[in-house]
Every structure is written in structure tokens, then in C-alpha cells.
Design a protein with these regions (language model features):
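Short aromatic/hydrophobic-glycine micro-motifs
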Residues: 98-99, 132, 190
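Structured helix-beta-strand junction loops
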Residues: 27, 78, 133-135, 187-188
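Charged active-site motifs of nucleotide-sugar-dependent glycosyltransferases
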Residues: 132-139, 166-167
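Solvent-exposed alpha-helices and their adjacent loops that cap or buttress functional pockets
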Residues: 74-76, 130-133, 200-202
């Protein structure tokens, strides 16, 4: 989520944060488990650490290796156990920041592995089923929310235009109508497919 959408929803975000803190105090759980979304959850972690005796567990560790590495100070202070779905993060946190974390596997990797076992790779059938040409494919995965698609798709199409020998295939997200994509696709030659993301990536 970019800066402007956050600004537009600031009142709602603060209201939800206040309610979340009140619920934690009222319920007094054995442990608070935070999931992803560091902009919101690190604030909750700080509150729980400073105002209660409840342990804080964090699932899907903040991607401080990509941006906002300074957040490690808050993580060390406020989070008791950190659980990662990316194997390389263990070395990053442990060696660089001396903060041990746990790699617990990746549900998406497990899902893809199960899909590959159940559906042997068959590129010819995929091309035929979707009326695609027998030429290399650039897969476009612009996101699952309208704001992400609005922000990402035009830039992706611009970058992909530098490869005229490839065909562009856009993986449509569930709940997003084809018409929404078409307003950003414009005159670009793009095939939009739904419910075939793993098949496309094979």
C-alpha cells in the first residue's frame, strides 16, 4: 500500500489500532501472534511489550533486508519470537543482527509443490487451451488488490514492451473483473487468464 492510500485511510487505521489494543488488554491472551503487516503490527508489538506481560510472537517476519532496516531495534525490543517463511532470513537476522529467528516453511511453496505433483508440466496444452502462440511468455502478476494493479500494471507493461519477441500473459486475480485490467492494458497485446497462475508459471 502506497503513501496516499494510507493517508486516506488513516482514521480507520488508528481506530482499528486502538480497538486492537483494547481487545488485547480485555482478553489478556497467553500470547499475541502478529502476522505480517509491520506498519501496523510493530506498533501493536510495542504496546504489548510496554503495557502488558504477554509474549509477542511474529509470523512472516518484516522484510527489513529490503527496506527500513532500522526496524530491527524495535523488533529486538518488542518481539519475543520471530517466525519466517523465507529461509535466507534466518542468516540475515542471526548473523547480521544477532537476533535468532525460526524458519517454519512456506505455505505457498508447499502448495506449488503439491500442484506440480498433481499436474505434470504440459506447456503445449496450456498454449492450446488459452489460444496462445508458440513463443516465449512474459508472465505479469500485478497483484491481488485493485490499488496494487493500478500502481503496478502500467509499469510492468512499459517494461515488457522492450521485449517484442515475447507474448504477454496476465494472471488475473480472483474477484477482479477483466474490465478492470483492460482499462490499464489499453492497446497492448495482453492475454488475461484466470485461475491458472501456477500453470502459467510452469
Amino acid at each position: 500500500m502506497g503513501f496516499i492510500p494510507v493517508l486516506l485511510h488513516l482514521r480507520t487505521i488508528f481506530a482499528n489500532m486502538k480497538r486492537c489494543k483494547e481487545d488485547i488488554v480485555a482478553w489478556n491472551p497467553d500470547v499475541v501472534i502478529l502476522v505480517d503487516y509491520p506498519g501496523f503490527n510493530l506498533n501493536i508489538a510495542k504496546f504489548v511489550h510496554s503495557e502488558t506481560q504477554i509474549p509477542v510472537f511474529y509470523y512472516i517476519s518484516p522484510k527489513i533486508w529490503a527496506w527500513k532496516e532500522y526496524r530491527i531495534k524495535n523488533i529486538k525490543r518488542d518481539v519475543d519470537e520471530l517466525f519466517s517463511i523465507l529461509p535466507f532470513e534466518v542468516e540475515f537476522y542471526t548473523l547480521k543482527h544477532r537476533y535468532p529467528i525460526h524458519y517454519v516453511g512456506n505455505p505457498t511453496v508447499d502448495e506449488v509443490t503439491a500442484y506440480q505433483k498433481a499436474h505434470p508440466k504440459n506447456p503445449e496444452a496450456f498454449l492450446a487451451d488459452n489460444n496462445l502462440e508458440d513463443k516465449p511468455i512474459i508472465a505479469l502478476l500485478a497483484g491481488s488488490r485493485k490499488q496494487e494493479i493500478k500502481d503496478n500494471l502500467p509499469d510492468m507493461l512499459k517494461a515488457a514492451s522492450a521485449f517484442p519477441d515475447y507474448q504477454l500473459v496476465l494472471a488475473g486475480a480472483p474477484g477482479i473483473a477483466p474490465e478492470y485490467y483492460k482499462q490499464y492494458v489499453g492497446q497492448a497485446k495482453v492475454k488475461i487468464i484466470f485461475a491458472q497462475t501456477y500453470r502459467l508459471l510452469q
